Amino acid sequence: MNKNSKIYIAGHKGLVGSAIWKTLKSKGYENLIGKTSENLDLIDAASVKNFFATEQPEYVILAAARVGGISANNNYRAQFIYENLMIQNNVIHYAYLYDVKKLLFLGSTCIYPRETPQPMKEEFLLTSPLEYTNEPYAIAKIAGIKQCESYNLQYGTNFVSVMPTNLYGPNDNFDLEKSHVLPALIRKIHLGKCLEEKNWKAIQYDLNKRPIDGVDGNSDKKEILTVLEKYGIAPTPGSMHGQYSVEIWGTGTPSREFLWSEEMADACIFIMENIDFEDVIPKELKDVFKKNKQKKSQKLSANGFSKTEIRNTHINIGTGKDISISQLANKIKATIGFKGNLYFNKSKPDGTLQKLTDVSKLHALGWQHQIEIDDGIRLLYNWYCGLKEEAVLERFIQH
């Protein structure tokens, strides 16, 4: 992949895609293609076929997906599995038909079983049942991994799958129903601070920028307070000093790993520039794969891969470090300066108790993270408030 290569980033406006787009630009890649969902419906096969026929991209980064937190995953199960499967099927298949040189498929570490050993190694995939709340999304992402592997083995394509851990960063989703835990906590605690400081202008500004359930900054004050209370941002019951509380689902004991989105983008570009599918298959099968790739037959070569199974070729992308939800919430509280209470609602689900990636494969390939969670929280909160902070980012961009 060179600086003039024609690169299509599917999902270039989201958290993942926008980070990849920005990082590609910073590294001197100029010939980038991006289409919004209004301009290109990736669920529609005919539209995707027409796009590939017209644009003829050389490289594809598949970051488009329907995503969300525990509530959204559980409430919109059919949409999560259908839309993600259709997006993947269309983009991967037409990338093959139109001779894309390389495709990078982005999944999620929710592909691993609920009770998988920690840290999660790539070979733990499909070894036991998934977490129920996000099972449809996870199954779709597993299908994407298998589709890439299968096309590589049968058609000789160069499609690589990566599984990033929980991401956070610029252009994150702060919708209180559909967002992931870290951006949701930042917004809820920020609004809690605004309430305790009686900073009504800041609350109105926040809701005008990101309305909640149709309620914006121009809505009636009572209506605003009601919708905030619905999402657990409300006066502390029985408080004599006007304190406010922020509700957090679960016990706070589960731990999660978090990676700054622009570092994830850096890892993805590193893989696009340096790592091919043949680099993540067993050494003893590389020659067989190369021969089969040269033939580009629609059936496996006579020697094939029957004696040794090729699976789990995906690459985990993460930090290899985790933090409890309780610790995370308190770090965010300290960063924002909220003086109220954090209320952990134990009647709500925790989800998987621990999700920590084993990143030894990624490290062996030559990439490691640099931004730690404390810096990342500050960076994201400053971004959320409209502030810019480049000092921390320069450390890994220059690297």
Where are these regions (language model features)?
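Short-chain dehydrogenase/reductase
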Residues: I81, L85, T133-I145, D175-P183, ...
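Active-site beta-alpha turn of Rossmann-fold NAD(P)-dependent dehydrogenases/reductases
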Residues: A64-A65, L104-S108, M163-T165, G252, ...
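Active-site Tyr-X1-5-Lys
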Residues: Y132-T165, V181-E197
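Conserved Rossmann-fold NAD(P)-dependent oxidoreductase catalytic core, especially the SDR/UDP-sugar
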Residues: N89-N134, V160, N173
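Active-site segment of SDR-like NAD(P)-dependent oxidoreductases
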Residues: V67-G68, T109-P117, T165-Y168
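NAD(P)H-binding glycine-rich loop region in Rossmannoid oxidoreductase-like domains
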Residues: A46-L85, L97, R114
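N-terminal Rossmann/SDR dinucleotide-binding element
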Residues: M1-R66, L387, V392-H399
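C-terminal substrate-binding subdomain of Rossmann-fold SDR/epimerase-dehydratase oxidoreductases
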Residues: A10-L15, A19-K27, L191-H399
